[in-house]
């Protein structure tokens, strides 16, 4: 308002490998618009954290410093944050994303025997791409793994009223055949696998794994420190994460309740948390992440325990680890997750818990690019910016 440069608003400066004169002009135009800061948008650049990137950043930083400006750095080469500049493309399996999937089979009538060849269920069912994924993903080049694990066999009674209506059949694991005499009532056999062959971004970090998230720091943050240590905390204000995700489910689907998800985000930390919560038979409760209808109190307990584990792991291993690194190096950490349609409280394209997802950041934020937040409050109409019912 007084024509003095401000840092309250800072635009994104999209970089495509422009020449030096253009880069200097862009920085000056931002400054002359009474804006004292900007965020370097790395994703369209042809050589992020490569020689041309450092060449272009040298120019931008020199110009920004001469004008007394600050800049933030968007922290990845692909959208969303988590690609780690390609560091996960050939990463060991244990660092990659993993999902829990469930296949349910109707049991025969009460008193009859269910016999199942477990060799037919050694692997999870193949993933089915959504229409959006068929158009936007190169399905022939999606990374695939052969380390599927059959982890649990559980019989679940329809309209069950408690733990007595969950039958742990894991003693059959490792055997050729499962034999189960069906008790009174209507039952389903739930076959649960861990698989890495799910999700649209299989070459992204696992947000629940400290070692996996460290790949992002090593690939992006550390090289910037190595090149520009003298700018940290002065011209370089910090780093920006854009819409990091857990990545299970389908590409940018929204509005699904937990029991409607085709797969659930997983890590070794989730296994540990559920074992601590439910004991040695923890895996017999896994069908209740999906099963409808069943005792609502027990379903709620299982789902809350799962989501609590997932989101605490995200906070600790991703958000706080990155934020702690930034503060230890004299800069700040900011960004946002997908919030539309309450997605901030879900997995898939977001991180399951708004405050834990941003717990390591110095300033929390939201995306307001489609008019979904207005001066009088949130838009209460029936549609989101993507045309989906809210």
PLM regions and their residue ranges:
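Hydrophobic faces of well-ordered beta-strands that scaffold small-molecule active sites
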Residues: 9-13, 38-40, 71-74, 237, ...
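Hydrophobic targeting/anchoring helices
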Residues: 44, 80-84, 91, 317, ...
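Active-site beta-loop-alpha junctions enriched in small/polar residues
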Residues: 16-18, 43-45, 76-78, 241-246, ...
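Hydrophobic alpha-helical scaffolding
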Residues: 47-50, 203-210, 214, 308-312, ...
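Acidic/glycine-enriched edge-of-secondary-structure segments
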Residues: 9-16, 205-209, 365-373
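Mature extracytoplasmic enzyme cores
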Residues: 1-2, 8, 22-32, 50-304, ...
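Conserved short loop/turn motifs at secondary-structure junctions
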Residues: 41-54, 307-312, 339-343, 371
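Catalytic domains of carbohydrate-active enzymes, especially glycoside hydrolases
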Residues: 21-43, 59-63, 70-72, 325, ...
